[in-house]
């Protein structure tokens, strides 16, 4: 495969499906791929418009209209309790429409320690799912939601006694979690770890049953049977990132302004490893930092640790081959328009790193796409980067992985699971070939929905385009994508269901007359001072556009009749005609 390797030493804008970074892979022997443009939704090369603006839109949904302040987690919990106590209507039933073939933003994946065929996955707003066949088919874990657990899943781990832990909450979204939940029977029943609330990360080792938690109250640990969590004395503030070695010896975490701390004695003591790169330390004051620890020890009998620092783009990457004692920066800042553009203005939204299990000197980094770094020089450590996935090719291409990667997990046979805004992707050959694994994994985030008179449904989704289901595909819940990017509000004509209206960022509005097979854009009449629709970041065009298809005249309606006058009338005369059906006048 002739891929280019980069060697490095010590609401609404035009849709995002374009071919950035495609050139280096077009030279490969994988075949020739067309860019996944979906016609009118092609853009100028940017993958997405919107992690920050999508979050801003979501936060606006959680503002109290009376106070103007964001609704607190405590208030949301109170509201949920009130709703749960309301009497249910006995006359209303719901049927799930799907999609069962398209996923959504996935922050957490966990492979069962006792059975690698069983895999759990969690969406940031879709709840918990389980697969019993390595991700081929997923089923919702209803018992998790029925227990009162929060559907906003941030992280998962499983201790050696088989207890599964699911963390809820986020440091970015407007919603918080309602604690860390655990199951001792593979998801059949659930309980809450005492006194937990918003938790962004949980990890565990292969040597004991402690679960370590990154929380707003610092680093905590707990095991089944403990009356309360134990606070781990690192420093004050929020624990923002956390990883642990399989043998439990090494714990690396970040606090506050992402200051790095390392423990080499299983969490008994921590050392501050923040400082300048020139002093072989990890700089702090990064908006986001992610860590990874090697599964095995390196040739010097130490663990290899990695740190990836980002703002909107890459700030730096660092490696330590001596259990975190000293660190070497092996790449510095990079971002658009550079070809080496891992995060593409979204470094605080999508960032993840993992060490290849059998090679402490090789990592995979997830941003918009997935990249590999392999160390080729020992002193100082340096090597080359290689892009191993592309979001912009057709989904059946062997190099396709959906954009915006958030999670990476390996099973004991080195089968690799990636969680992203499109759901779950899998590789069994270290990233040389990929396939999507979303059947039944319905965690898609919808901005708006529409339906027609025959029962077909359509919806605009976060980073999964505009989707349409007229129940004619292989399953009742299978959708097809009729538009790209972030789909927003949409409409289907009642009079002619072949007519559809869809929207994407910044007032881009489109019409289809053939059920979404082809589209044409149209623009409303605007003042001359307005930017053209689709203008990136325009103050005149909001990220999210709301539309309403006004179909007031229905020639088939029975609520009006034609009347033939039998005499002359003057303008303004009142005419009363008794209704033959009820005696009421019309």
Regions found by a protein language model. Give the residues of each.
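Beta-propeller blade termini and top-face loops
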Residues: 25-586
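Transmembrane helical bundles and short interhelical boundary loops of multi-pass, membrane-embedded
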Residues: 2-3, 22-25
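Hydrophobic membrane-insertion alpha-helices, especially the h-region
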Residues: 9-20
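N-terminal Sec-pathway targeting helices
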Residues: 1-11
């Amino acid at each position: 495969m002739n891929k280019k390797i980069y060697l490095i030493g010590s609401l609404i804008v035009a849709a995002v499906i374009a071919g950035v970074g495609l050139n280096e892979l077009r030279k490969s022997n994988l075949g020739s791929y067309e860019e996944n443009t979906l016609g009118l939704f092609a853009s100028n090369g940017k993958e997405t418009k919107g992690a920050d603006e999508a979050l801003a839109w979501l936060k606006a949904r959680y503002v109290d209209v009376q106070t103007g302040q964001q609704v607190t987690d405590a208030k949301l919990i109170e509201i949920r309790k009130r709703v749960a106590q309301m009497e249910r209507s006995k006359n209303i039933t719901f049927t799930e429409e799907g999609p069962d073939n398209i996923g959504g933003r996935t922050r957490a994946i966990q492979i069962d320690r006792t059975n690698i065929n069983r895999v759990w996955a969690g969406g940031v707003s879709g709840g918990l799912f389980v697969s019993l066949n390595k991700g081929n088919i997923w089923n919702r874990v209803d018992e998790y939601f029925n227990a009162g657990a929060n559907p906003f899943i941030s992280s998962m781990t499983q201790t050696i006694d088989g207890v599964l832990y699911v963390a809820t909450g986020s440091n970015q979204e407007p919603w918080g979690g309602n604690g860390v939940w655990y199951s001792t029977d593979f998801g059949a029943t659930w309980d809450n770890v005492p006194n937990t609330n918003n938790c962004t990360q949980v990890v565990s080792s292969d040597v004991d049953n402690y679960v370590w938690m990154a929380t707003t109250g610092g680093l905590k640990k707990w095991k089944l049977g403990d009356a309360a969590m134990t606070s781990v004395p690192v420093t004050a503030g929020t624990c923002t990132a956390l990883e642990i070695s399989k043998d439990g010896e090494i714990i690396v975490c970040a606090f506050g302004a992402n200051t790095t701390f390392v423990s080499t004695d299983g969490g008994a003591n921590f050392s501050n490893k923040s400082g300048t790169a020139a002093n072989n330390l990890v700089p702090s004051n990064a908006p986001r930092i992610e860590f990874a620890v090697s599964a095995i020890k390196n040739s010097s009998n130490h663990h290899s640790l990695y740190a990836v620092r980002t703002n909107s783009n890459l700030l730096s990457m660092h490696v330590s081959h001596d259990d975190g004692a000293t660190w070497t920066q092996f790449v510095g800042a990079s971002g658009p328009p550079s070809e080496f553009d891992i995060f593409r203005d979204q470094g605080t939204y999508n960032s993840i790193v993992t060490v290849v299990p059998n090679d402490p000197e090789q990592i995979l980094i997830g941003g918009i796409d997935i990249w590999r770094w392999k160390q080729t020089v020992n002193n100082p450590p340096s090597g080359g980067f290689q892009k191993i996935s592309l979001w912009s090719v057709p989904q059946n291409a062997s190099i396709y992985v959906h954009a915006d990667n958030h999670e990476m997990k390996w099973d004991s046979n080195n089968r690799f699971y990636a969680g992203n805004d499109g759901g779950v992707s899998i590789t069994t050959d270290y990233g040389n070939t990929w396939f999507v694994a979303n059947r039944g994994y319905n965690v898609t985030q919808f901005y708006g929905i529409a339906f027609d008179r025959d029962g077909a449904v359509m919806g605009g989704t976060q980073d999964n385009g505009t989707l349409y289901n007229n129940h004619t595909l292989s399953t009742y819940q299978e959708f097809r994508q009729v538009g790209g990017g972030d789909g927003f509000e949409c409409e289907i004509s009642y009079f002619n269901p072949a007519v559809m209206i869809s929207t994407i960022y910044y007032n881009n509005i489109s019409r289809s007359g053939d059920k979404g097979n082809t589209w044409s854009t149209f623009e409303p009449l605007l003042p001359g001072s307005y930017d053209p629709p689709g203008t990136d970041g325009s103050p005149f065009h909001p990220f999210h556009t709301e539309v309403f298809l006004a179909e007031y005249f229905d020639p088939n309606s029975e609520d009006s009749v034609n009347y033939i006058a039998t005499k002359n009338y003057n303008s303004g005369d009142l005419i009363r005609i008794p209704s033959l059906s009820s005696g009421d006048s019309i």
